[in-house]
Amino acid sequence: MKIKTRFAPSPTGYLHVGGARTALYSWLFARHLGGEFLLRIEDTDLERSTQPAIDAIMDGMNWLNLDWDEGPYFQTKRFDRYNAVIDDMLSKGTAYHCYCSKERLETLREAQMARGEKPRYDGRCRDSHEHHADDEPCVVRFRNPQDGSVVFNDLIRGPIEFSNQELDDLIIRRIDGSPTYNFCVVVDDFDMAITHVIRGEDHINNTPRQINILKALGAPVPAYAHVSMILGDDGKKLSKRHGAVGVMQYRDDGFLPEALLNYLVRLGWSHGDQEIFSVDEMKQLFSFEAVSKSASAFNTEKLLWLNHHYINHLPADYVATHLVLHIEQQGIDTRTGPQLAALVKLLGERCKTLKEIAASCRYFYEDFSEFDADAAKKHLRPVAVLALEAVRANLAALSEWTPATVHAAIEQTAEALQVGMGKVGMPLRVAVTGTGQSPALDVTVHAIGQSRCLARIVKALDFIACRTQESAG
């Protein structure tokens, strides 16, 4: 049997982390077993479905590199197929017209709730022989079995059973003629030969209804796996109030797709105590036997830790391709400084996101108009003039400009002045970067470049002289 899974989001909002994890699990299961993975857009909610949401889903899938073998399919383009199946069910008696008014159904619901009963349709039209005009408004309901039970073996949770007496006759076609979500899903899974349905646990209650419809159609019943929800740090379902965002927001915040994938796969699945997984390892190792039934808590610090790991362990040239977006957002022209791959190596250890790298790299490419006030107050003082003049002379004398020769020049200056390296290094760092923090000074000075560093030291000396004059005045 060829394994075939699907990811079937509704385009009513962005692709959130819960949906992305479901997509990842479905994709990994298919790839692990050499099967196929398809993308289906379940856009039957015409009022809430939007093109921007469809675009966000596609962008998120592409950014995460979750490629699909078929699709994307759109349910709104299959309405003729759904209605043809419904008409066939009506002719076979597995579905029926229901003419009950909204008012009657609301009265029925209120009475059932007043008696402490679960609200459900009472089947009034199920076996009715009343005559109705062809144009009388009605819905179509599925004739659900009234006895027995539905049992399915969830790949994560084990056997789950529902009594058919608990299931009412589901509406499968609305009064406006449009098919309903639960019905469209069944026809799609049948037509598209889906063998494994992997989705969130909020769909468990839909499963027995869908299985009964499949059986009524004479269709094979797929296997099901219902993934537990993701919680916020307060133990409640992850939502916008926890800062939950769409997948593409993680890109915009400077995360690598490898980091988010690694984080999402571990958000419910494990392989021993291993934390770092390449995509190839995920495909090789993934199985539902190792997926937890319990809800998982989203931990941003863990995601940041993984992102820092991937920034520093993936090839710098590759990381640089993802850094471009953030550099452009900062408006930095990188033609007059180190290559972006070199920048990744320079700042990667100090930064947890690509956005942080872009925000802290400007001094490598552009001259700054002001020094950081605290750093200048502490290190650009008259006592630093001698060190800055001496180190400038030694740097200017270098015929070979490498981190090693830069380091030797700084060390030579400190030895000549009989002071510690910090007495030379800190004023020099503030002079050439404008701040009190940077990567190792020798590689920083080297990356900024000889002529630019020499000019910035002069600027720092002028700054000290100006401040000294102001103080004296």
From Swiss-Prot:
It is found in: Cytoplasm. It comes from Sodalis glossinidius (strain morsitans). Monomer. GO terms for cellular component: cytosol. Keywords: Aminoacyl-tRNA synthetase, ATP-binding, Cytoplasm, Ligase, Metal-binding, Nucleotide-binding, Protein biosynthesis, Zinc. A motif ('KMSKS' region) lies at residues 237-241. Binds 1 zinc ion per subunit. Zn(2+) binds at C98, C100, C125, D127. Its EC number is 6.1.1.17. A motif ('HIGH' region) lies at residues 9-19. It is an enzyme of class 6 (ligase). SUPFAM superfamilies: An anticodon-binding domain of class I aminoacyl-tRNA synthetases, Nucleotidylyl transferase. It comes from the Bacteria. Pfam families: Anticodon_2, tRNA-synt_1c. Belongs to the class-I aminoacyl-tRNA synthetase family. Glutamate--tRNA ligase type 1 subfamily. CDD domains: GluRS_core. This is Glutamate--tRNA ligase.
